[in-house]
């Protein structure tokens, strides 16, 4: 029994060491696939644009833009326990604070990736902030905007393979700082 306990402890230590050495992967996925990704997988939302401040923006069929928090930010922040959303009708410009997430005493503001008027907020997140962590590109969206200058602002956002390269740079930067 003592030998089994000793072997189990060694195995746990080895597993932890291997996990720490494992290099994260980055891939483009369908929105629902991000829900099943491991901690070492960073998911880029297929068909969505990503801002340099880690908000994604997806153009909906009616021309509105759905906005949320990207997988990189949600994994860097961990689980958060509160969300603050803009009021319906709020006018924002690209770069203005749009939504806030918090954990404990800390709060992080995320700027809007595009300019426009808030036409809806995902109020479910106020009562269930972890939904944004569980389903970042599907049910965990934060706001829906009616864009005002989308054609001019889209070139500042990344989509597809450029997001993968940027995530890899961000991961390397984060690991170097650790």
What are these regions (language model features)?
Residues 86-104, 116, 145:
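A structural signal for short beta-strand/turn segments enriched in small hydrophobics and glycine
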Residues 59, 103, 112:
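Conserved strand-loop elements at the edges of beta-sheets that form or border functional pockets
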Residues 1-82, 88, 108, 121-178:
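Non-catalytic terminal segments and appended small domains
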Residues 109-115:
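Histidine- and aromatic-rich ligand-binding microenvironments
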């Amino acid at each position: 029994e003592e030998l089994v306990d000793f072997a189990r402890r060694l195995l746990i230590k080895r597993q932890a060491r291997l996990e720490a050495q494992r290099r994260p992967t980055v891939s483009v996925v369908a929105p629902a696939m991000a829900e099943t990704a491991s901690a070492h997988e960073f998911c880029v939302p297929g068909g969505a644009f990503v801002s340099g401040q880690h908000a994604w923006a997806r153009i909906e069929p009616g021309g509105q833009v759905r906005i949320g928090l990207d997988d990189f930010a949600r994994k860097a922040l961990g689980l958060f326990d509160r969300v603050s959303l803009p009021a319906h009708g709020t006018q924002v410009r690209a770069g203005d604070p749009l939504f806030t997430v918090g954990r404990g005493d800390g709060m992080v503001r995320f700027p809007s990736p595009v300019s426009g008027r808030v036409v809806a907020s995902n109020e479910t997140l106020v009562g269930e902030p972890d939904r944004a962590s569980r389903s970042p590109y599907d049910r965990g969206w934060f706001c829906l905007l009616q864009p005002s200058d989308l054609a001019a602002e889209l070139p500042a956002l990344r989509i597809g393979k450029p997001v993968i390269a940027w995530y890899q740079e961000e991961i390397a930067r984060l690991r170097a700082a650790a």
